[in-house]
Amino acid sequence: MGYKILIVDDAAFMSMMIKDILTKNGFEVVGEAADGAQAVALYQELQPDLVTMDITMPEKDGITALKEIKAVNPSAKIIMCSAMGQQAMVIDAIQAGARDFIVKPFQADRVIEAINKVLS
């Protein structure tokens, strides 16, 4: 059985790209959220094995959502995804509990490598 993954990104194109990479590699995408508030609600409902989380989103950003999910489940596995390879953002995300960080545009092998590392 494949691992269940929740994709969080406000850009439909990015969600679609990640979903395509994941499904081709045997992962099951159980949900997609377009903002941080939706991400927290779906995480609690779906209990995925892993979350890919964009940082810059409307309503609630990815780092705030990351902190809220970690408050609900301290062992939650979350990988941050962002076009901003800004050092401060990466440090904030890791300090808040993110397990890894992927910079857009994604390379399929890097996405899979990060997910396998976090799930192992």
Feature names for model-found ranges:
Residues M57:
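Receiver (REC) domain active-site loop signature in two-component systems and cognate sites
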